[in-house]
Regions:
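Structured catalytic/nucleic-acid-binding cores of DNA maintenance enzymes
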Residues: 1-124
């Protein structure tokens, strides 16, 4: 499990990359994570602009304008990856468990922006 300073580094890095960016599409591959993802999750995020990425304890919070938000907890083995849309290279691996090739079956959520996407990957 990442410690608090590691989560803060992920927050800072994520904030630099996605602040003021608009979500084009959300892909949910697994709704049954620690907390079941709500049915309206995609609708709440798609076509919304990120205002900032904040943190409460070890929870990452992607804040959107007009009050919507997305809460992420990395758990024991979760990672966040920023991947260019052509999938040929990673912009940033916001993980301390570097894995260049993500097993697709563990890519639970993708948040797609204009030229890149965020992938939440967790083998647990």
């Amino acid at each position: 499990m990442p410690e608090l300073p590691e989560v803060e580094i992920v927050r800072q890095s994520l904030d630099k990359k996605i602040r003021q960016k608009k979500v084009k599409k959300v892909i949910i591959r697994n709704r049954n994570l620690r907390i079941k993802i709500p049915i309206n999750f995609k609708k709440k995020l798609e076509n919304k602009k990120v205002s900032k990425v904040s943190r409460f304890s070890k929870y990452l919070i992607i804040n959107f304008y007009k009050g919507d938000f997305c809460i992420i907890h990395l758990g024991m083995s979760g990672t966040i990856h920023l991947i260019r849309d052509n999938f040929k290279s990673s912009l940033t691996n916001l993980s301390f468990y570097n894995s260049p090739l993500l097993p697709k079956k563990h890519n639970h959520i993708e948040i797609i922006f204009d030229k890149f996407r965020i992938i939440y990957n967790d083998p647990r």
